[in-house]
Amino acid sequence: MSANEYLKLADDVALEIAEGRLRPGERLPPQRSFAYQRGIAASTATRVYAELLRRGLVVGEVGRGTYVSGQSRRGA
């Protein structure tokens, strides 16, 4: 997988959020499940989730999971 592939995957999830397929407060799958579903390494899934967090699209709650943020920062 190329170094920027995680950015494309993050863009894909961001589009799902923008289009309303993932709604505020909705829980994303655990990173390992996300990796399995997308056919990627767990480390790549970790990078995708970190990028979504950096963009303000998701929030992580230790022991509870990762959720779509109530407000997104478009263009971040």
Each predicted region: which residue ranges?
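N-terminal basic, amphipathic alpha-helical segments
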Residues: 1-76
